[in-house]
Amino acid sequence: MAVLLPVAGGKGGVGKSIVSLNLAVTLAHQCRNTILCDLDLGGANLHTLLGLKNNQAGLGTYITKQETDFSNLLQATGIPSLQFIAGDCHYPGVANMDFFTKKKIIKNIQSLDADYVIMDLGAGSTYNIIDFFLTTYDGIIVVSPDLTSILNAYSFLKSAVFRFCYRQFAPKSPERQILQNSILQRMEGKEYSFDQILSVIASKFPESAEKAISEMKKLHPRIIMNMGRGHTDIELGNRLLNLTRNKLSIEAEYVGFVPYDENVTLSIARRQPLSIMKPDSPLCLAMPEIASRLEATVSGKDIFLEDVQENLEEIVNSYYDKLNKKDRNQYD
């Protein structure tokens, strides 16, 4: 069964699709059979970044039932070990698919024959985007080192945790009503952590609350800091970890630091992945370590660090150590 890697961004402009694309190429270069799936249905553009024409069947074709065999959506990219499923933005309204269509797409994605399926999601926090993000316990969220990105990522994770928790209880149940009431109280200026909300549910419905708490503990979002400028980003980046721990009662983890890379603009203009066009660029140097960290998580190795600041600081230091070593080798 393929490992699913849903990649979300709390807001547009954080470079989510660039990260998804180059991570997919990196995994393919490591001989991992990889499928890149464009699930940004309102603004699909990965075909452009790959240098492919948008003239083949995609998810829009499937949603509108013009193609009924999901496997026919797979197309070659010209890159060994990498296949692609287009979002197909020719059909208006496909981003607002019904629940059963979404469920069918998720089931088909889970059945794909590959080592990894990277799911590039749309920006924002609609239920469709969140449900694709929650196809795994440890989805990836891409942030940039600015306050609006950090706060939007927190808002996205808050919506995802609420959606995840809500789905643990039966429809029209009193437990769901307590969760809904917590949203109303938040609108009135009273905000509670998920620990506090679940404690209220546990006091009345201990059995169902225990199951929900057990599932909540499995949530482990992974974060990639993109367009970083250096060590000054660490303090800002750790705000997101502290917010998720204190307010959402979940443990998130940084798995990558991707520096700002001026070559990205040129790679977009040339319609060629940067990992192909200029594999020694700053962004591309960061990708193998991200792939290794993700693979270590999948293989069951415990790479989580309890000290949240050490987590991001270690990743930033590791990147610049690698960069300095590369620079030294050029002059040896």
Question: Could you say what each language-model-derived stretch is?
Answer:
Residues 122-253:
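Conserved catalytic-core segment of NTP-binding enzymes
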Residues 110-128:
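Glycine-rich phosphate-binding loop used to anchor ATP phosphates in small-molecule kinases
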Residues 2-40:
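Walker A/P-loop phosphate-binding motif and the immediately C-terminal alpha-helix
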Residues 37-115, 171-173, 178, 182-192, ...:
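P-loop/Walker-type NTP enzyme "switch/lid" segment
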Residues 41-43, 89-92, 124-125, 146-149, ...:
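Conserved nucleotide-binding/hydrolysis micro-motifs of P-loop NTPases
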Residues 269-286:
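C-terminal boundary of histidine-terminating zinc-finger modules
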Residues 248, 254, 259-270:
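Nucleotide-binding motor/catalytic cores of P-loop/tubulin-like NTPases across gene-expression machines
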Residues 179-180, 304-332:
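A short, charged, Gly/Pro-tolerant segment at domain boundaries
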